[in-house]
A protein has these predicted regions:
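C-terminal beta-signal and adjacent terminal beta-strands/loops
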Residues: 192, 250, 297, 346-352, ...
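Residues on the lipid-exposed face of transmembrane beta-strands in outer-membrane beta-barrel proteins
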Residues: 39-45, 114-120, 172-176, 229-233, ...
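Gram-negative outer-membrane beta-barrel transporters
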Residues: 43, 121-127, 136, 239, ...
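Membrane-embedded beta-barrel scaffold of Gram-negative outer-membrane proteins
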Residues: 1-14, 177, 183-189, 199, ...
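Short loop/turn motifs that connect adjacent beta-strands in outer-membrane beta-barrel proteins
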Residues: 46-55, 124, 181, 237, ...
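Transmembrane beta-barrel strands of outer-membrane/channel proteins
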Residues: 1-7, 58-64, 129-135, 184-190, ...
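Solvent-exposed loop segments that connect transmembrane elements
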Residues: 11-29, 72-102, 138-163, 198-217, ...
Length: 442
């Protein structure tokens, strides 16, 4: 049993010379805060029944999450001209400033879950039947900051209607020990995902740049049915696992949808009636000390591939990432260790261009993130039993690259309609950088 409370707050300030012709310094302050508490209770019971051994696990999870957000900004003249009468004076153009606003009503999200499973062992077989019940309640709060954004004139309808969803999802897993080293596994599982508060209620518009983000209060929860099978092996020299999966979705939630047609670019989350995601994953580790190398030296690697398809129109799913591989050479001892890793990502070449617009404003087609390779060096040192220092040198070669998730989700805030190369550059990942963490286990 555990009770956890967490507060996460992000406060970001940006400043830029937005339009070179007017020389105005624009500042934007963005705040996002999440408060949540989670209560977990889990019980286990082991017993034998005939020739079978049972390990029953059951419990509940209660979670409450409160989210708040706002943004505001101003502008200062850095040169005289184009309406600016003095250096340091506020910009006279109203569009340069942003009244304190929010793109979504502050939601309170209550989730309650019950789960139970029975791990049944018999001879070389293991059976794992499981069931889960989820209940989600979403209560939006219409703050003045949100109303400043979505309905400053009172012309548009604004809903603060509470949403509730619930569903029972089963799962059944199966393993068979082929030998002492090799195990086959398979699984059937159903999934359930509810829409976000931003997709249901959030609204934002920037008519000067010709785009709006609209809510969709009619979004349905997403459901899925999936199968997975594979084989894993474990030896003194290392381990490996290979798996393939196939998932079918109903009412797949696409939060990056661009509405085609109209005089103003419009973005709105939608349900895709039917969708499919399939793929394969492989990972492995080789203990090099088993072949005469120094004790603790190893190499590891993983490759993941997924293929997504909108079954309504045959187009790709933009939420599916390109082929990715991670390979590393590491050294571990009880109190210290390090890892040199190389991440390789293929160019994103499967994009539904009808629902995606390039953040660089290129009307010839969507921006497809190029492939890249990034090298990272990480290490850890255990100071005491409870205190560990870890850190790393990331992107050692100072590679300029984009993650597809960052580019595709840029659409969801509407800014893909903003032309200008700077918008694309600020979506790049950090160059060469350093991070150090201190972990204290209490």
């Amino acid at each position: 049993t555990s009770l956890n409370s967490q507060i996460a707050k992000t406060d970001q300030t940006t400043a830029e010379i937005y339009q070179s012709g007017r020389r105005v310094l624009r500042t934007r302050d963005t705040l996002y805060q999440e408060k949540q508490w989670i209560f977990d209770a889990q019980l286990d019971k082991a017993f034998s029944l005939g020739e079978t051994d049972h390990q029953v696990t059951y419990g509940t999870t209660l979670k409450q999450q409160k989210v708040t957000g706002s943004r505001e900004g101003g502008a200062t003249c850095v040169a005289v001209g184009s309406g600016c009468t003095a250096i340091g004076a506020p910009s006279p153009m109203a569009s340069d400033s942003v009244k304190k606003s929010s793109d979504f009503p502050d939601p309170t999200i209550n989730t309650y879950s019950l789960f139970a499973q029975d791990q049944i062992s018999w001879d070389k077989w293991t059976f794992l039947p499981a069931v889960r019940y989820d209940y989600t309640q979403l209560k939006p709060k219409l703050t003045q900051e949100f109303l400043n954004t979505v309905n400053p004139t009172g012309a548009d309808p604004v809903s603060d209607k509470e949403k509730t969803w619930h569903r029972v999802t089963p799962k059944f897993g199966l393993t068979y020990a082929l030998t002492d080293q090799y195990t086959w596994f398979g699984q059937y599982a159903e999934g359930f995902r509810t829409p976000s508060a931003k997709a249901l209620y959030g609204r934002f518009e920037n008519l000067n740049l010709g785009y709006t983000v609209e809510p969709n209060p009619d979004l349905k929860p997403e459901t899925s049915k999936g199968i997975e099978t594979g084989i894993r092996g474990k030896f003194d020299e290392g381990s490996f696992e290979i798996a393939v999966f196939y998932n079918k979705y109903r009412d797949f939630i696409d939060e990056d949808n661009a509405v085609v047609g109209g005089t103003v670019e419009q973005f709105q989350a939608i349900n895709i009636k039917r969708a499919t995601i399939k793929g394969a994953e492989a990972k492995g580790r080789l203990n090099l000390d088993a072949f005469g190398a120094p004790q603790g030296l190893y190499t590891q690697g993983s490759v993941s591939y997924a293929y997504g398809r909108n079954d309504d129109n045959g187009e790709p799913l933009n939420s599916v990432n390109p082929l990715k591989g991670v390979f590393g050479l590491g050294y571990d001892q009880d109190n210290y260790g390090g890892l040199l890793s190389w991440t390789l990502v293929k160019k994103q070449d499967r994009v539904d261009s009808s629902t995606f617009h390039a953040p660089d404003g290129d009307t010839s087609g969507p921006f497809k993130t190029p492939g890249f390779g990034v090298v990272d060096l990480t290490a850890f040192y255990k100071v005491t039993q409870d205190v560990t220092i870890n850190g790393g040198l990331y992107n050692l070669t100072d590679k300029k690259y984009w993650n597809w998730d960052d580019v595709r989700s840029y659409d969801s805030v509407g800014e893909a309609a903003v032309t200008g190369p700077a918008n694309l550059d600020r979506l790049t990942q950090p160059g060469r950088n350093v991070a150090i963490n201190l972990i204290w286990d209490i």
